Design a protein with these regions (language model features):
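Compositionally biased terminal segments of proteins
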Residues: 1-187
Length: 187
């Protein structure tokens, strides 16, 4: 298959749907979700698919090979695209909390399961909370500025992770960003 000049979103939809049609259930996570939910404000060149069952690694590899991807270390590469595909082992979780209800994007008959905007914000905040990653904080703010997110759910999750103070900082920055618009200042 020729993937030249395909967007990350289009490729993610195609790969995710192809895996699903081959019986390999996945959820797209990580930077690809940030890119999709921030409308490409933040670029990512990897598609991290969490397998719903660890035994799906081999069928997943075979499905990717059908599309022309080849295994290269832990990633899969295709000669027509700069995007890499990686399988992560289950469960789909953010910090210690499982992701129970992934979002779905449909395009025609294609279907992609991915982190919801709320879970995508939590995923980025986890890197900020635990490793002080400022880029991840900026990504969380970018996703929150462009999507309806459940701040109560994020607050509950942050509290369960012992990160009340950092959540308060995030919430203040998010409120400031709403005042200045989604392209407002960096954190």
């Amino acid at each position: 298959m020729n993937f030249k000049n395909w967007s990350l979103r289009r490729l993610a939809l195609t790969v995710g749907d192809h895996l699903r049609r081959r019986g390999v259930e996945t959820v797209l996570t990580g930077g690809a979700c940030v890119s999709i939910h921030s409308r490409n404000r933040f670029a990512s060149f990897d598609l991290d698919f969490v397998l719903m069952a660890a035994e799906d690694r081999r069928p997943g590899r075979l499905a990717l090979e059908e599309l022309g991807f080849r295994k290269d270390g832990r990633h899969f590469r295709h000669p027509d695209t700069p995007y890499l595909v990686e399988f992560l082992l289950p469960p789909v979780s953010i910090g210690s909390a499982p992701v129970l209800h992934p979002a779905e994007i449909r395009s025609g008959r294609r279907l992609l399961k991915l982190l919801s905007p709320t879970d995508c914000v939590k995923d980025r905040l986890a890197a900020y909370f635990f490793w002080n990653d400022r880029l991840s904080l900026a990504q969380a703010l970018g996703v929150a500025a462009r999507n309806a997110v459940d701040f109560r759910d994020i607050r509950r999750w942050a509290k369960s992770e012992g990160m009340d103070e950092k959540f308060i900082h995030f919430k203040k920055l998010a409120a400031d960003a709403r005042k200045t618009g989604p392209e407002g200042g960096a954190p």
